UniProtKB/Swiss-Prot annotation:
Record organism: Ehrlichia canis (strain Jake)
Originating gene: hemC
Name of this protein: Porphobilinogen deaminase
Entry cofactors: dipyrromethane
GO CC annotation, single: cytoplasm
Cofactor detail note: Binds 1 dipyrromethane group covalently.
Amino acid sequence: MNIRIGTRGSVLALAQTLEVTNLLNRYFPEINIQVVKIKTSGDINNKVPINTIGGKGLFIKEIEEALLIGKVDLAVHSVKDIPAFYCDGLIIPCVLKRSSPYDVFVSSKYQSIKSLPINATVGTSSIRRKVQLNYLRPDLQVIPVRGNIDTRILKSDIGEFDGIVLAEAGLIRINKCNVIKEVLDSKIMLSAVGQGAICVQCRADDYNIINKIKVLNCHKSYVCVIAERSFLKTINGSCDTPLAALAQYVDSDTIYMSCMLSNEKEMVFSDCYFKECNAEESGIDMGKKLINELYGSC
């Protein structure tokens, strides 16, 4: 059996795809795997803030199109790149075991965000990070930065920024943890929905593929992603919506989730404990609660 895996061509995307291919090879050694690199709109338009050109869906658009027309059999994505609603006819039956969901501070000159001087410049591609940085340190000059991880680190090293904020999981996957100066606690920098998680997407009617990739699924990671994405869908969030959510198990059946929503003038937070069987419902309830707190009842 041959399986074609669609992925972006970045170093990070290929590292994530390698995790999937290694698992497939472990469980199904008879399968012949071909990795198909696909350049997405988000890769092509890499000089301007992503929220100004269509949002995070641009990182998966062409890959989903390739799936739908049968050019590839499955696709590997970062969960945080998946918009609230994706293409009809596709499903995500598998989330790999989640890596770190946290953000990190990277700088060649400073050891922490707290140690940054007044009016220091911090680079980030995320409006979620921007509003939380400005809440923590209103004096900071938060500036958009695009490009792959190495490009962003280089921009910081050569002095374009005093520091940058990145996802720890990406640095782990490409063996760049040595640049990390500070892991940011979720109490000051709550994570993006699905941050640190890799998912596998396929056609909804391709039952042979579905049955195979379900074997790779990490149940707890999948349930946490369901809870976080239910919150995202309720907000109908996109790249220009400052929101955050992190769900984590506290025991074998109980999950704790924190959420944040902002209109860039104020932020509202909510948290709760729930059983895994209530993951989707709890995400919806938290979304409705924060919408009501920020905007009032509709």
